[in-house]
Regions:
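Helix-rich C-lobe and terminal helical cap/extension of kinase-like folds
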Residues: 1, 10-34, 61-204
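Conserved hydrophobic/aromatic residues on the N-lobe beta-strands of protein kinase domains
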Residues: 5-6
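Conserved helicase/translocase P-loop NTPase motor core
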Residues: 30-46
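Short amphipathic alpha-helical surface micro-motifs
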Residues: 41, 50, 157-160
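Hydrophobic residue at the +6 position relative to the catalytic HRD Asp in the kinase catalytic loop
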Residues: 56-60
Length: 204
């Protein structure tokens, strides 16, 4: 055969076991930084997402490195999808938010059709998505973010849900994988109580 599967044994502890060793804040921050950087590097550079963000898929190694386990669930990301995702998140961060760029990114992602013009997008869809956008961008609004303080994922009102369903046309195949992995990352960082430098080349 031209392909041979190999395995490598990694020393280290899973998250809960590692936390029982009472790592200091610097160690928690370092581990959180590695998790954060790995997610964005995989998404925007490798275009290949480890789509199962279960804590058991990470090892905290004695030398401070992060071990990634179990690549049985990965998802390939299209370069155009990643570019549109980067544009959307970046547009949210501008002060004020760049609604025109957000509208275009929503179209590029296939979330809305050509019939939803920018004015209706801003007046009807964006208010329904505002809480979700605010939650998503919060870590990127400061240079170092304390994930221990990150709020729970917002639950939209029934009216906002109706508005979103009325205007959202379809869901890109890759988006649920990215959202699930991002939510998993946030939960890991919150459990760690990590303070992370969130500046990166893709969301700015």
């Amino acid at each position: 055969t031209r392909r041979v599967l190999t395995m490598q044994r990694l020393p280290g502890l899973h998250l809960n076991e590692w936390l029982l060793t009472e790592p200091d804040q610097a160690a928690r921050d370092q581990a959180g930084q590695l998790l954060f950087d790995a997610f964005f590097h995989c998404t925007f550079v490798l275009h290949r997402l480890q789509a199962d963000p279960h804590p058991g898929n990470y090892l905290f190694m004695p030398d401070g490195r992060l071990g990634l386990l179990d690549f049985g669930c990965t998802h390939a990301l299209d370069a155009d999808f990643c570019q549109a995702l980067s544009a959307l998140w970046s547009a949210q961060l501008r002060d004020p938010a760049d609604h025109s760029a957000m509208h275009q990114a929503y179209r590029d992602l296939g979330l809305i059709g050509p019939n939803l013009n920018e004015q209706d997008f801003c007046q009807q869809l964006l208010p329904a998505m505002a809480e979700r956008h605010a939650w998503q961008k919060l870590p990127f609004t400061v240079a170092v973010y304390d994930f221990a303080q990150h709020p729970p994922y917002p639950r939209p009102s029934a009216e906002h849900q109706r508005q979103a369903l009325r205007h959202l046309q379809s869901l890109p195949e890759a988006l649920p994988y990215v959202d699930r992995a991002y939510l998993g990352l946030i939960q890991l960082l919150k459990t760690l109580g990590a303070r992370v430098r969130t500046a990166n080349p893709w969301i700015r």
